[in-house]
């Protein structure tokens, strides 16, 4: 049985390739910012409007920690994007329910879990260094949608594993 080709697959392939490059560029930019900010802390504190009366040291340490945790997201994002790319390739070949895709989904779920944990830590650091004089609003912390995505991908990994086993059983009986 032949299946109609989807226009979404080539688009997904190109978008994932672009996102992989952008992810590494993001990592390079954050690394450059960390190096620059720590090389010129007085200029950096002025650039982000830290009031003159505040001790810049805890803010600098906190922001450096946040950026460093942001750098940890780069390889996690890379893992997610490359696994998705391989899955798109298997769908394009008409062979998505294979054990490799179940393993890929499981790896994606673990990476998403790690990203959620990073977000919690980043949110906590942001709240710790924020003050009335230096309000810091980060899009980090607890996310119901993020945690639901983690659960969903773990479940999908199991569905793919079962689908691959059922397919192998079916091929063995035909």
Regions of interest found by a model, annotated:
Residues 67-89, 156-165:
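Transmembrane alpha-helical segments in integral membrane proteins
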Residues 115-174:
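Alpha-helical transmembrane segments of multi-pass integral membrane proteins
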Residues 20-31, 72-76, 80, 109-121, ...:
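Hydrophobic alpha-helical transmembrane segments of multi-pass integral membrane proteins
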Residues 94-127:
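Hydrophobic alpha-helical transmembrane segments of integral membrane proteins
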Residues 12-22, 104, 108-112, 173:
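Loop-to-transmembrane-helix entry motif
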Residues 9, 81-104:
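Cytoplasmic juxtamembrane regions at transmembrane-helix boundaries
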Residues 58-75, 142-155:
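Hydrophobic alpha-helical transmembrane segments
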Residues 2-11, 25-66:
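Interfacial loop at the N-terminal end of multi-pass membrane proteins
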């Amino acid at each position: 049985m032949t299946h109609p080709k989807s226009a979404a697959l080539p688009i997904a392939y190109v978008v994932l390739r672009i996102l992989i490059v952008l992810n590494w560029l993001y990592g390079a930019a954050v690394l450059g910012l960390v190096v620059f900010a720590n090389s010129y802390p007085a200029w950096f504190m002025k650039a982000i409007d830290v009031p003159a009366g505040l001790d810049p040291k805890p803010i600098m340490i906190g922001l450096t920690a946040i950026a460093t945790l942001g750098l940890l997201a780069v390889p996690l994002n890379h893992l997610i994007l490359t696994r998705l790319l391989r899955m798109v390739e298997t769908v394009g070949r008409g062979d998505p329910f294979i054990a490799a895709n179940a393993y890929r989904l499981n790896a994606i779920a673990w990476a998403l879990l790690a990203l959620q944990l990073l977000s919690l830590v980043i949110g906590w650091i942001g709240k710790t260094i924020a003050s009335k004089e230096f309000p810091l609003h980060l899009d980090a912390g607890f996310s119901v949608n993020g945690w639901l995505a983690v659960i969903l991908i773990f479940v999908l990994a199991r569905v793919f594993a079962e689908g691959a086993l059922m397919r192998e059983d079916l091929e063995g009986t035909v």
